[in-house]
Swiss-Prot record:
Disruption phenotype: Mutant embryos exhibit intra-uterine growth retardation and have small placentas due to a reduction in the number of spongiotrophoblast, glycogen trophoblast and sinusoidal trophoblast giant cells. They show an incomplete penetrance of embryonic lethality preferentially affecting females. Knockout have heterogeneous spermatogenic defects and testicular degeneration leading to infertility in the most severe cases. During spermatogenesis, mutants show impaired recombination during leptotene stage of meiotic prophase leading to chromosome asynapsis. Knockout females are fertile.
Quaternary assembly: Interacts with UBR2; does not lead to Tex19.1 degradation and stabilizes it. Interacts with piRNA-associated proteins DDX4, EDC4, MAEL, PIWIL1, PIWIL2, RANBP9 and TDRD6. Interacts with L1RE1.
Any Pfam family hit: TEX19
Record carries keyword Cytoplasm: yes
Intracellular or extracellular location(s): Cytoplasm
Coiled-coil annotated residue ranges, if any: none
Region ranges (Disordered): 55-90
Highest taxon above the source species: Eukaryota
GO cellular component, as recorded: cytoplasm; nucleus
Location of region: Important for interaction with piRNA: 117-164
Name the UniProt record assigns to this protein: Testis-expressed protein 19.1
Length: 351
């Protein structure tokens, strides 16, 4: 399975290598390695490939394996002979140990062949993959460099002590309330069959918003851009939301068609901003996604398990009447609103 790399992510400022690192964190062997160390390992591997060491090392390994088999077969044929004192000294160290010198029947010590000097290291401390064990990493046609088509040998990645930002895997769960600037990882499950291509495209187009706090009719909103959407090996969806601009907004409530009311705005904590007949509306993401065929399994790092009541149809509707952008680019937020035209311009911005 290849990393989800495409021109779309590159247009948003995300490099193909960064996409591969994110994919490794989510779908790899749960190795905690920062992007800087991952990039250094990639560049070192790329340098080896460009130097042409790949084929040469494979040929050397094949020659060493053949010589080792020949040597072991000769040793078995001579096993009936009485071992000398020099052989007794190292016999208990294992059948793969090769001494610095061996004794023939005449008692003369002869040096071992040169090819035996690296046997212990290559057997007990493997540093490379065999060709059949390598996993190809295709970074996409837009980076059609000859080294990209060759198999990677990064199976031996080791964890680093650097901080991982963003926390993308299930073992990176926060025990305290995270800061608003951290990304969010959604795990979605389908409760009816969905077309994979259509579902991925639809999730990419959604405008997620975090409701950070609210006092009476005033609230703080944080827009969350969809970085990528991937289909996991267990047939779930993972959606990475990257924090964007901060808004100070005013909202109003409208009585809905259902009799079930929420005493708080918790169901709107993660919302999707949509255009409706009454203006810009905040829809609870759990309820809206449920109606589209998705069930939110987890909402990291905020919630490991989503409350069941958040998927219920709310008894009221929330509409944004005005919003002021805080500490970000005005034109960026304006483009966000331009993509959601409303019949009634209820949403105004103050640059």
């Amino acid at each position: 399975m290849c990393p989800p790399v495409s021109v779309r992510h590159g247009a948003r400022g995300m490099s193909c290598l960064y996409e591969a690192w994110l994919y490794h964190l989510v779908h790899g062997e749960q190795t905690k390695i920062c992007f800087a160390c991952f990039k250094a390992a990639f560049l070192l591997n790329k340098l080896y490939l460009e130097m042409g060491d790949w084929q040469e090392e494979e040929e050397e390994e094949e020659e060493e394996d053949a010589d080792l088999l020949e040597y072991l077969s000769e040793s078995e044929s001579e096993s009936e002979q009485e071992p000398g004192p020099e052989q007794d000294a190292w016999r208990g160290l294992g059948s793969l140990y090769v001494p610095q010198s061996v004794s023939e029947g005449s008692g003369v010590l002869l040096p071992t062949p040169v090819w035996t000097q690296g046997i212990l290291f290559s057997i007990f401390v493997p540093t490379e993959l065999f060709p059949q064990e390598a996993v190809p990493l295709d970074l996409g046609p837009e980076d059609a460099e000859w080294t990209q088509a060759l198999p990677w040998r990064l199976d031996g990645l080791f964890p680093c002590s650097h901080q991982l930002i963003p926390p993308l895997t299930w073992w990176d769960i926060f025990d305290v309330m995270p800061s608003p600037g951290q990304p969010v990882l959604l795990e979605l499950r389908c409760h009816w069959p969905l077309d994979q291509t259509v579902a991925q495209s639809w999730l990419q187009d959604q405008k997620f918003v975090l409701l950070l706090d609210s006092v009476q009719s005033r609230c703080h909103l944080l827009s969350m851009r969809v970085r990528w959407v991937v289909r996991t090996q267990v047939q779930h969806w993972q959606v990475l939301l990257d924090p964007g601009e901060m808004w100070v907004a005013h909202f109003r409530k409208e009585v809905g068609q259902h009799g079930l009311y929420h005493q708080s705005l918790n169901p709107w904590r993660l919302s999707i901003l949509t255009a409706s007949e009454l203006g810009m509306e905040l829809l609870p993401a759990t309820c809206y996604l449920w109606n589209k065929g998705f069930w939110v399994g987890s909402f990291l790092p905020w919630h490991i398990n989503m409350p069941e009541t958040w998927s219920w149809e709310p008894g009221e509707r929330l509409f944004i009447t005005d919003a002021t952008i805080c500490g970000t680019d005005y034109h960026l937020a304006q483009s966000f609103l331009d993509s959601h035209p409303t019949p009634h311009p209820l949403l105004t911005l103050t640059p």
